[in-house]
Amino acid sequence: MLKYIIPTIMLMPLTWMSKGNMIWINSTTHSLLISFTSLLLMNQFGDNSLNFSLMFFSDSLSTPLLILTMWLLPLMLMASQHHLSKENLTRKKLFITMLILLQLFLIMTFTAMELIFFYILFEATLVPTLIIITRWGNQTERLNAGLYFLFYTLAGSLPLLVALIYIQNMVGSLNFLMLQYWVQPMHNSWSNIFMWLACMMAFMVKMPLYGLHLWLPKAHVEAPIAGSMVLAAILLKLGGYGMLRITLILNPMTDFMAYPFIMLSLWGMIMTSSICLRQTDLKSLIGYSSVSHMALVIVAILIQTPWSYMGATALMIAHGLTSSMLFCLANSNYERIHSRTMILARGLQTLLPLMATWWLLASLTNLALPPTINLIGELFVMMSTFSWSNITIILMGMNMVIPALYSLYMLIMTQRGKYTYHINNISPSFTRENALMSLHILPLLLLSLNPKIILGPLY
């Protein structure tokens, strides 16, 4: 485990000691090396658990998320270069340090063995993200967005702390591996209902559940590109990961407590997908689409069958790469046209033909085109919800159609048609951007050849 944590910590002195012209090259190459070493974790069997120490362990649920976390840092650094080109050197170094700190916290969160340790790190990821949003965001609205982000997440996760202390007093341990053997079945009582809510709400706000999702589009729209990427790709997956881990100790309460939340999520994914159809703001559209994809994951986790768990883990990884790529594309438009409104950025295919290819690929993966892992995840979730209740096929079918509509709408609005006249001096697409997009799309295509490595512990 230390072979990921120590190089990540050493990235910070590397950044601060680099000269101005070498800072991006050094940090990006070093973080790419870390992400390549993390691929060694891939050859892990489904039922295997690597116990690194008393603090850290990884199994086949946390491994794909861990690799995704490490894969995203070099991509975030590549994407942020233009955004920070006007800043002075100290600010650049501070920004990179924030990203590295965030990655460090996330690596430790996904491998934490104690629930309290997991909780502390889960909250610690809030601080660098908040600094990134409120310091390097684009508009003055970013302070408001940061407040929303902070208070939704904090108010959601404080009851979890109380619940964890209660479990510690009852059981005597919060170790993931011990809890499997020690935990008692929860009986149906008011105190246990509140306990269930306290444990689940923290992660449902983070996912976010429809109704508690208001912070997400705000935070996405105001965050700089690296903030948006890490928020969509990894911080939302923290919620799903936490839910998958904590449902272990909440049985058999989840069987009947899950009904309102499953209904809310099924309804919410249709609603947020429909909201996407009438968005004018590009980043807001991608933000709402990630709410609707995460609603599927909530449904899958609450149904609690092996198939739905596999679908949830596959969908989390697929959505992480897809939404991150879409945010990069939206940002490359924003850097050229200085506007996120889709009406002002029409007909870019004639100006940037290679970018149009990336837009097409990203839109197709977002609408779950076969044979991508997005489709594999969605099909697993769809089949498990259908076997849970037949009537959900209507909602699920709508949820297959509406993302196709808004993805194609986004593609046609930005790429097709006649370009607007205020686009006069537009820079061509850089090699950096093309490399960034290909590093997003290649893992998606390669994983669709062998999806079993991301199907989680039950495969």
From Swiss-Prot:
Pfam families: Oxidored_q5_N, Proton_antipo_M. It comes from the Eukaryota. Disulfide bonds: none annotated. The keyword Manganese does not apply. It is found in: Mitochondrion inner membrane. Belongs to the complex I subunit 4 family. This is NADH-ubiquinone oxidoreductase chain 4.
